[in-house]
């Protein structure tokens, strides 16, 4: 315990660690606030002039006129009728033909509902969504019964022809059956906000990788490790203390910043929106059985598992590195490696590789969030595996394996010494 406290104090007292932790906390607040600036609202004032709002003011304006609560087929029909009435009034063929102030006054509250209805009734062979005037009141009454059919067509469009396609279809339908219907909705947290949670996870991983990289390598660079390895407690006990201290500091920083992001985001957008079904944010056939609020916490915990696996890899690299530069280079490359593999290596091999390397699931377009809301499957031996499930199931295995390799590598140095 004394070694652990000393190592914790040593790492925390370095100027670089303090700076990086401060940057991480600032990033958490900034990443929560930026999506707020994307929200807009336009209306006419008492004189008939257009007045536009952005940010918090726009959010409050939208919330004053929103549709909220359980979205029943009757509410869906009400939304369609409002849209079609305005479309006829302005002889519109698309939303661009509607005056901006009319859109915000008459239609903005119904937009998520109508957009999801268009997606639900998209052509099963082409995926093309119908226009507003192509939908009927009967369609709205059948909205929820249409969703399994839409899911089946989406899986067919994206996965047909692959070995194990039928199993992928069955997995998707089983997951979607667990989604609570009818959906609930309240304007607030946006898809952009969830994107920024993913970006924050990537940035925090980069910062914490920089903190963890020198934990062992700095002693190797200065020669202090040669002395430590010859002491009574310089073997496994010291290695365990260093590993525990590094995990404690980076883990606490990640969780603190993640919680700050959630609290600030919900305070800005409104806590009511945490009850919104995630299907309104991403896709009407998203397989996740969560509300937005639940999704925020699920993503924090899920990304934390992957983050821990990456930190374990960085610490293993630090054990074998002879100087800080080597350890830092390996750490930074390993964080972005899944994104590079995802973009460069084609086919099933690239998908498996980007999933199984330590930081798999951390990144941008390859991030865990998009695997959870999408329909990405991995195939092997005629079997299909939901990629998000593989990412989460493999993370604890990676952690145990990499921590074990780090300890083994340090013990090998002890024997040599």
Model-identified regions with their sequence ranges:
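Hydrophobic transmembrane alpha-helix segments characteristic of membrane transport
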Residues: 219-226
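Short helix-to-coil transition segments within interhelical loops
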Residues: 229-235
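N-terminal, intrinsically disordered, polar/charged segments of Gram-positive cell-envelope systems
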Residues: 38-135
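Central hydrophobic cores of alpha-helical transmembrane segments
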Residues: 21-25, 325-338
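Aromatic- and glycine-rich beta-strand/loop motifs that create alpha-glucan
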Residues: 1-21
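Secretory targeting signals
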Residues: 26-78, 82, 139-219, 240-320, ...
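Juxtamembrane non-transmembrane "cap" segments at the membrane-aqueous interface
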Residues: 268-277, 346-372
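Alpha-helical transmembrane segments of multi-pass membrane transporters/translocases
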Residues: 17-20, 306-314, 371-417
